[in-house]
Amino acid sequence: VVVTISHLNYIKRTNLSEYRRQSRGGKGSKGSDARDEDFIEHLFVATNHNYMLFFTEKGKCFWLRVFSIPEGTKTSKGRAIQNLINLEPGDKVKAFINVPTLSDEDFINNNYVIMATKKGIIKKTTLEAYSRPRQNGIIALTVREGDELLSVCLTNGQQEMLMALRSGRAIRFNESTVRPMGRGASGVRGVTLADEETDEVVSLICVDPNGTSDI
């Protein structure tokens, strides 16, 4: 199936067969009936048995099986994510990861969740820590006052982190320099901001240390 998530956090799954193949250079086809202020921000292919882990700006984690995401047509808007999980008032989803399994012991103990906050804090936790869901979510990160969770990525333990700042600077380092922590930990300094009042992390991506593609 194809899972789409919009800028305003509307989500749906659609049968892959609705996206027919077209010739290169064509006009494409309409993929959503989003409102003017909304647009498709994420689109990926998954199986119905994959898991979606959602992370909120206050540091909580919720998960859904892909088959429990409401099915829609290619042009439908989808359902608001906050209607599918028990978000606290004032909290909102900031990041997500698509996970193929949470039952394979080897996979969940050798893959990691990397989180970054706006104030430059980074945290690494084994995927195993997120393999037992609760209806009201679980703590993924203890967010310090004045900060919020920004980005999350799934890694294999050997990738490199690239954090970009609003000031135009960026830092790259191997994830092996960040030790795994428990879910309740608040993380460690990943990058020092140029100015605590005006600078902030705007993006975190995880890259293959031997990769040669452009970022």
Place the predicted regions along the sequence by residue.
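Short, structured "edge-of-domain" segments at secondary-structure transitions
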Residues: 1-215
